[in-house]
């Protein structure tokens, strides 16, 4: 699951 939600809206965990 996204900790640092960079692209969590689109479903891509960029930061984490």
UniProtKB/Swiss-Prot annotation:
Transmembrane segments: none
Cofactor note: Binds 1 Ca(2+) ion per subunit.
Catalytic activity: Preferential cleavage: Arg-|-Xaa, Lys-|-Xaa
EC number, UniProt record: 3.4.21.4
Keywords noted in UniProt: Calcium, Digestion, Hydrolase, Protease, Secreted, Serine protease, Zymogen
Subcellular location: Secreted, Extracellular space
Propeptide residue range(s): 1-8
GO annotations of cellular component type: extracellular region
GO biological process: digestion; proteolysis
GO molecular function, one term: serine-type endopeptidase activity
Keyword Secreted: yes
Entry coiled-coil feature ranges: none
Cofactor(s) needed by this chain: Ca(2+)
Protein family: Belongs to the peptidase S1 family.
Protein name: Trypsin
Organism listed in the record: Felis catus (Cat)
């Amino acid at each position: 699951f996204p900790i640092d939600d960079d692209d969590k809206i689109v479903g891509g965990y960029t930061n984490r």
